[in-house]
UniProtKB/Swiss-Prot annotation:
Annotated localization: Virion; Host nucleus
Keyword Translocase attributed: no
Keywords noted in UniProt: Capsid protein, Host nucleus, Virion
Family designation: Belongs to the herpesviridae small capsomere-interacting protein family.
Purpose: Participates in the assembly of the infectious particles by decorating the outer surface of the capsid shell and thus forming a layer between the capsid and the tegument. Complexes composed of the major capsid protein and small capsomere-interacting protein/SCP assemble together in the host cytoplasm and are translocated to the nucleus, where they accumulate and participate in capsid assembly.
Keyword Lipoprotein part of the UniProt annotation: no
Ranges in a coiled coil: none
Residue stretches spanning the membrane: none
UniProt name for this protein: Small capsomere-interacting protein
GO cellular component terms given for this protein: host cell nucleus; viral capsid
Comp. bias intervals (Gly residues): 12-21
UniProt main location, coarse: virion
Assembly and oligomerization: Interacts with the major capsid protein/MCP.
């Protein structure tokens, strides 16, 4: 059914924008596109696939990953590059400007200016003591 919904929209011309938006309009088409993206090898991804992934949501990605984990047997070669494809899809989702607007990170970024802001958000200097005391200074004492 997802192929018929993609074939019904020839208005996109070369298919770079029209096919992705038509696939996004139907119910499970974004999840199906994500499953196809996650199943293909990372070297064979097309720019159209990458643009379609950037238009999907994080909920679609988690649903696609759940579907793949239940469908794939343990010896399947797709499991070898599933982690790389998931990382690529997450980076595409993070760079999408639509998701940046939904997250509204500006007030949080304003609070994170300076070391006091990082301290209040739980990044402690005790986790990296080499920043406070370089080895050259400790040898001179």
């Amino acid at each position: 059914m997802s192929t018929s919904s993609r074939q019904q929209s020839p208005a996109g011309g070369d298919g770079s924008t029209g096919g992705g938006s038509a696939a996004h309009c139907s119910g499970h088409a974004p999840v199906n596109a994500l499953v196809e993206f996650l199943r293909t090898a990372p070297r064979t991804h097309t720019p159209e696939q990458l643009q379609a992934i950037a238009r999907s949501s994080i909920n679609d990605l988690s649903e696609a990953l759940r579907a793949l984990r239940t469908d794939l047997p343990k010896g399947d070669p797709v499991r070898g590059f599933l982690r790389a494809n998931t990382t690529l899809a997450l980076s595409l989702l993070n760079h999408a400007p639509r998701l940046r607007e939904q997250l509204n990170i500006q007030p949080v970024a304003a609070r994170l200016t300076g070391p006091q802001g990082f301290w209040s958000f739980g990044i402690r200097q005790r986790n990296r003591p080499q920043i406070l005391r370089p080895p050259q200074l400790s040898r001179k004492k």
